[in-house]
Regions:
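Acidic/histidine-rich, metal-coordinating catalytic segments
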Residues: 102-123
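Short, basic alpha-helical nucleic acid-contact segments in DNA-binding proteins
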Residues: 17-33, 166-170, 188, 192-194
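Mobile-element integrase/transposase regions
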Residues: 19-75, 83-90
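Active-site-proximal acidic segments at structured loop/helix or strand boundaries
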Residues: 160-203
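RNase H-like two-metal-ion nuclease catalytic core shared by retroviral integrases
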Residues: 108-109, 121-122, 142-164, 176, ...
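Active-site beta-loop-alpha junctions of metal-dependent nucleic acid enzymes
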Residues: 77-105, 124
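DNA-recognition alpha helix
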Residues: 1-8
Length: 203
């Protein structure tokens, strides 16, 4: 009624639909992505159960550990044959060494090696005791992404897709496991060299 007095002549249903869409858009904007200052945060995930074959037709099933610093977008990836907790710890230590530091917080998907009870809208996350102790020893705060909120881990999900796209052409092209590991290591270097070049060009 107030806006009618101010001269609005449109239908109420149109206005209601507009307000509804505006509210939805504002809600989406609130969870678009996680952005932080330098040294604050990183994201971790796995590219799970990739399958490739060497020149002789032998099958290799493996995982790619994914680590991305939020601000600089520096990345660390490495091939693993399993996703056990000890493997995760080793990958994290290697990532800290590669990036020359430990961020204040690291965002994780709700993987079993990290959480005993996932974070939900109504319940707080319960971290695995061994993992939580590791985080304290390494001096970072673990943060669990809420399920079905892909915006909070967009960097690692984009990286996972990119890694698969870059590795897939080598299917049936490499000789053995050693060369496969080297392919992933070379890609890790290439990812960061590419990122540095893009930043330099933008400046």
């Amino acid at each position: 009624k107030y806006i009618e007095k101010k001269g609005y002549e449109g239908k109420y249903t149109i206005l209601r639909e507009y307000c509804k869409n505006k509210k939805q858009n504002e809600t989406k904007k609130a969870t678009i992505r996680v952005e932080t200052n330098p040294g604050i945060a990183a994201q971790v995930d796995w590219k799970e159960d990739m399958v490739m074959h060497d020149k002789f037709g032998r099958t290799y099933q493996f995982n790619i550990f994914l680590y991305v610093l939020h601000y600089s977008k520096m990345k660390y990836i490495t091939l693993t044959w399993d996703r056990k907790q000890d493997t995760l710890f080793e990958c994290l230590k290697d990532a800290f060494e590669y990036t020359e530091g430990v961020p204040k917080e690291i965002w994780f998907d709700n993987m079993r090696t990290v959480v005993d009870r996932p974070r939900t809208q109504y319940k707080k996350v319960v971290f695995n005791n061994l993992f939580y102790q590791f985080s304290k020893d390494a001096n970072f705060e673990p943060i669990a992404c809420r399920p079905y909120r892909p915006q909070t881990k967009g960097s690692v999900e984009s990286l996972a897709k990119f890694v698969e796209q870059r590795l897939r052409p080598y299917d049936y092209e490499f000789y053995d496991a050693v060369e496969l590991i080297e392919l992933v290591d070379d890609l890790c270097h290439e990812l960061n060299h590419l990122e540095i070049s893009q930043v330099t060009e933008q400046r």
